[in-house]
Regions:
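Conserved catalytic loops of ABC-family nucleotide-binding domains
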Residues: 139-161
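ABC ATPase NBD coupling module
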Residues: 74-88, 98-100
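Helix-to-loop junction immediately C-terminal to a conserved catalytic motif
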Residues: 58
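Conserved beta-strand-loop-alpha-helix hinge in the C-terminal portion
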Residues: 174-203
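Conserved coupling/switch loops of ABC nucleotide-binding domains, chiefly the family-specific signature
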Residues: 64-67, 177
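Conserved ABC transporter NBD signature motif
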Residues: 66-74
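A short, flexible loop at the N-terminus of ABC-type nucleotide-binding domains that lies
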Residues: 1-32
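The feature captures the beta-strand-to-loop junction immediately N-terminal to the Walker
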Residues: 43-45
Length: 204
């Protein structure tokens, strides 16, 4: 049996208030696996941990506990410069965060892949002019058809954003309250009480 495309096994990330004040400030717990190619929608409030989730999958942010496995590879054991051959995080320049390396590169293993298996789109900008949206949706579908796993994270501020998620995504996650909750389809996620509170007037 082949390894899942992505598995987060008992993963948690804990941030503390500071070097001297070790009081927990934020915790995110994640546990799921995805075996088949798909386009996955991700929603959640600002500061809920969506970018932290993507950083852990891409291997730039080390989990406090647990393992992130991409196509059978433990991301924290893959050479730093080769991690984006397994999972690549597309984000805005203001989102880039630097994290210390936890072990020397010579102790790490090669990625074993020349093209990313997991593609993480963190709040992509959907330009409504000149067919750009259609181009992006076709790109996401092409990646899936090439047996890749695609995550599209949006913070909906307009009905268009929900329409795009409904059109392109086959399953969903909602990040909030320190957890990452799975939903089988668009109808299920927008019917959830927590999600409706988050969406506000867009849920009506």
């Amino acid at each position: 049996m082949s390894a899942p495309l992505l598995a987060l096994d008992g993963v948690s990330k804990l941030y503390r208030r500071g070097l001297l004040d070790r009081t927990p400030a934020f915790r995110l717990d994640v546990d799921f696996r995805i075996d088949e190619p798909a386009i996955v929608g991700v929603m959640g409030p600002n500061g809920a941990g969506k970018t932290t989730l993507f950083e852990m999958i891409a291997g730039s942010n080390t989990p406090t506990e647990g393992r992130v496995m991409v196509a059978g590879h433990d991301m924290q054991r893959v050479r730093y410069r080769e991690r984006d051959r397994l999972a690549i995080h597309y984000h805005q320049s203001y989102q880039v965060r630097r994290f210390p390396r936890t072990r020397p590169n010579f102790m790490l293993e090669p990625a074993g892949s020349s093209y990313p298996v997991v593609h993480l789109f963190d709040e992509p900008q959907f330009n409504t002019q000149d067919g750009y949206i259609g181009f992006m949706l076709d790109f996401f579908r092409r990646l899936r058809d090439e047996r890749r796993l695609v995550f599209v994270c949006l913070h909906p501020t307009a009905a268009l954003h929900l329409e795009l998620l409904n059109e392109i995504c086959e399953r969903f996650f909602f990040v909030g309250g320190g957890a990452v909750r799975p939903f089988a389809d668009f109808g299920t996620i927008v019917a959830d009480a927590d999600v409706r509170r988050y969406l506000g007037a867009l849920a009506d």
